[in-house]
Regions:
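Acidic catalytic/metal-coordinating carboxylates
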Residues: 37, 63-68
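Short amphipathic alpha-helix used as the core "switch/output" element in two-component signaling
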Residues: 67-79
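Active-site residues of response regulator receiver
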Residues: 58-59
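Two-component/phosphorelay signaling modules centered on CheY-like receiver
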Residues: 13-33
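Acidic, metal-coordinating helix/loop segments flanking the phosphotransfer/catalytic sites
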Residues: 34-54
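Negatively charged, flexible loop motifs adjacent to catalytic sites
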Residues: 62, 88-92
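Conserved acidic carboxylate
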Residues: 10
């Protein structure tokens, strides 16, 4: 099985590292890039969206929003699959 080329947009280094470790135990995974904010996530996607099979996106970033990243992915011709994360467990977010 070929590794899943994964792009991660997550502003917390601890969550990002734990997420990668957990996923690597479950599936063959190749993290192709990571971003911590909307601007750098969009910049990478503009140049490399075709280089990933899966995007894992945190909705609430310290700078910007994961929603803008998801909108940009929606506009790509070859869209990778997306997983949306949130560290907030409020009723509104659910």
């Amino acid at each position: 099985m070929e590794p899943v080329r994964t792009y991660i947009v997550e502003d917390s280094p601890i969550i990002r590292e734990n997420l990668i470790a957990a996923l690597e135990e479950l599936v063959p995974l190749e993290v192709v890039a990571c971003a911590e904010d909307e601007h750098s996530a969009l910049h990478w996607l503009h140049e490399h969206a075709h280089d990933c099979d899966l995007c894992i996106v945190d909705i609430f970033l310290k700078q910007g929003s994961g929603l803008a990243v998801l909108r940009a992915l929606r506009d790509e011709r070859r869209r990778p699959r997306c997983v949306v994360l949130s560290n907030y467990a409020t009723v509104d977010v659910r």
